[in-house]
UniProtKB/Swiss-Prot annotation:
Pfam families: Terpene_syn_C_2. Binds 3 Mg(2+) ions per subunit. The lineage of its organism: Eukaryota, Fungi, Dikarya, Ascomycota, Pezizomycotina. Its cofactor is Mg(2+). It catalyses: (2E,6E)-farnesyl diphosphate = (+)-eremophilene + diphosphate. The Asp-Asp-Xaa-Xaa-Glu (DDXXE) motif is important for the catalytic activity, presumably through binding to Mg(2+). This is (+)-eremophilene synthase. A motif (DDXXE motif) lies at residues 100-105. Mg(2+) 2 binds at E105. Keywords: Lyase, Magnesium, Metal-binding. It is an enzyme of class 4 (lyase). GO terms for biological process: terpenoid biosynthetic process.
Length: 357
């Protein structure tokens, strides 16, 4: 027996939802016509082959990585990058996803001591005169070092500084996540606590700085630190994690990952549909925050303002590219299910274990 609640959620006879209606994630600033980097196919083949060989992936893992298509993600985020910069972005996306998985569902997700050690060593890579990591013992750390070397060759000095600052924000957020997981003892986190943490762990802060590198943006440190610019960065990060937590909800439930906004709200008494609706409310708040930040942006003068505009474009293309990729990648849905979800805004939950309404 299947029943309909409020015209948008179906449940089975035992009271468990089999589908849920998601927010419209392609409205307002996310309705922009997408662009994809013309170097996508050329760079993808080389980058996929490299990472499979470098991380010694078996055939199954290599196929899984290829279907994830991190090159499409980079191509949508940095459509104007040349082939060299696009390749650096793809390598970075491979690095951050494999690095992040260790903190989400790997050996570091509940071990703050080991997590802090790994974060400390990773941050040390960015220091002047740092020792080169051992490629065989620490392949991800070594890969991060090669990415940093490539960024230093081309990025303006202030953008290099921003690269370091934003990576520290991300890594500090991961450590906070590990500590929260360890100390949670099954107790639900508040919405506010989760948002503060998730804004940093989604990876948007460093990714936006990498887009700035890829597009050869020369943003001054003064402009970077202005509250209006920082708010645009925060909005880009918030849109990305809200959309990611919606699209990845099924994957996270199946994997036992609790770092998901929908799951957090459900532990606080929300139904699945109510949690999705609340995510939509936060998304719409982001759109208002975006325009308020632009309205309060100072006028520095032609040369600085031009770079600020290009940087703000990166703050926008990050969540937009991530959203486009999320609906297509095999990591979450795959192109067929992603297309159907985009058209219907109905997420099928019938293949999940029973979830309390």
């Amino acid at each position: 027996m299947i029943a309909t609640i409020n015209g948008d959620t179906k449940i089975n006879g035992k009271g468990h939802p089999t589908e849920v209606r998601i927010p419209d994630m392609f409205g307002s600033i996310m309705s922009a016509t997408p662009m994809v980097n013309p170097h996508h196919f050329k760079v993808k083949a080389a980058a996929d082959a490299f990472i499979a060989d470098y991380l010694k992936m078996d055939k199954h893992e290599a196929t899984k990585n290829r279907k994830a298509d991190f090159c499409f993600c980079a191509s949508a985020m940095a459509p104007h990058a040349d082939a060299e910069a696009l390749r650096t972005m793809v390598d970075w996306l491979n690095w951050i996803f494999y690095f992040d998985d260790d903190f989400d569902e790997g050996q570091l997700d509940r071990d703050p001591v080991a997590a802090e050690k790994e974060i400390r060593h990773t941050l040390a890579v960015l220091e002047e005169g740092a020792e080169i990591p051992d490629r065989e013992l620490h392949p991800l750390r070594y890969l991060f070092r090669t990415i940093w070397d490539r960024v230093k060759e081309r990025a303006y000095p202030d953008v290099q500084t921003q690269f370091k600052i934003t990576h520290k924000r991300y890594l500090d957020g991961l450590l906070h996540q590990v500590e929260a997981t360890r100390d949670g003892n099954g107790q639900p986190r508040t919405e506010e606590d989760y948002i503060r943490m998730r804004r940093r762990t989604v990876g948007g802060y460093p990714c936006i700085s990498l887009i700035a590198y890829a597009h050869n943006v020369d943003l001054s440190q003064e402009a970077f630190e202005h509250p209006s610019v920082q708010e645009c960065i925060a909005v880009g990060c918030d849109l990305a994690w809200i959309h990611n937590d919606i699209v990845s909800y099924k994957k996270d439930v199946k994997s036992g990952i609790e770092h998901n906004f929908i799951t957090v709200l459900k532990k606080n008494g929300f139904t699945t549909q109510q949690a999705m609706d609340r995510a939509g409310e936060l998304q719409d708040e982001c759109y208002r925050r975006w325009y308020l930040a632009l309205a309060s942006m100072p006028i520095w003068g032609e040369s600085i303002d031009r770079e600020v505009l290009r940087y703000i474009e990166a703050c926008h293309s990050f969540p937009l590219g991530d959203l486009l990729w999320s609906f297509q990648t095999g990591r979450y849905l795959g192109a067929t299910e992603g297309y159907k979800l985009h058209e219907t805004r109905v997420l099928d939950l019938s293949d999940l274990e029973p979830i309390a309404v």
